[in-house]
């Protein structure tokens, strides 16, 4: 048995789904208000001054803080069933199925939020390591539980959950600099669906 590690946004999907999820789950008045508050940070992000993880943390805080956890989970379930399938690359699903037919362990390793990605992975019988939202007394706190699962954190999470040295071949699939450490773990690396050395 080998192991295949897949990034989600931009690798399995055609686009980043963080913002579409917030637009789907967050009430429109709060979304507009949050957009105004985040406008300077968005500009900084586009100029390369504000890191993506800082941008995501601020958007989570403004969009999801105080939301009922059960309601948020239901929104995540609906998003996974109604929106994600429209963004999934056919060849990505084919590759996942190819690995499963080989008897490989298939793990999605993503900075995407557990609140929706867990539903999609469960639906496709895939293991998951991803960014998790913190809750307290049935409400989302607007913070991540632990570090966002990007960059070096992807490698750390994989090593904490799996003995990668026990697998004859480790495959990894990614599409951005946030996947570099994930790709470095693998014998067979695919960046933007092209095999790289």
State the predicted function of each range:
Residues 1-48:
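Active-site neighborhood of HAD-like aspartate-dependent phosphohydrolases
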Residues 14-15, 33, 52-56, 65:
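Generic structural signal for well-ordered secondary structure
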Residues 1, 74, 81-197:
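C-terminal cap/substrate-recognition subdomain and adjoining C-terminal extension
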Residues 43-45, 54-69, 124, 128-133:
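Short, compositionally biased "basic patch" segments
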Residues 2, 29-31, 48-51, 69-71, ...:
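Conserved alpha/beta cores of soluble small-molecule-handling proteins
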Residues 55-91:
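Metal-dependent phosphoesterase signature
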């Amino acid at each position: 048995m080998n192991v295949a590690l897949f990034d989600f946004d931009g690798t399995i999907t055609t686009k980043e789904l963080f913002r579409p999820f917030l637009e789907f789950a967050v009430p429109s008045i709060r979304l507009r208000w949050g957009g105004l508050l985040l406008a300077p940070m968005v500009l900084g992000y586009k100029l390369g001054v504000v890191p993506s993880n800082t941008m995501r943390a601020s958007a989570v805080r403004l969009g999801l803080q105080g939301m009922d956890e059960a309601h948020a989970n239901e929104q995540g379930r609906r998003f996974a069933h109604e929106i994600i399938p429209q963004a999934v690359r056919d060849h990505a699903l084919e590759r996942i199925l190819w690995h499963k037919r080989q008897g490989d362990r298939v793990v999605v390793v993503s900075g995407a939020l557990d609140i929706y990605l867990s539903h999609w992975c469960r639906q496709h019988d895939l293991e998951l390591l991803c960014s998790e939202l913190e809750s307290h007394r049935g409400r989302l706190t607007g913070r991540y539980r632990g570090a966002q699962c990007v960059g070096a954190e992807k490698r750390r999470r994989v090593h904490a959950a799996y003995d990668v040295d026990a697998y004859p071949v480790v495959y990894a699939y990614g599409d951005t600099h946030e996947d570099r450490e994930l790709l470095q773990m693998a014998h067979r690396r695919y960046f933007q669906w092209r095999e790289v050395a």
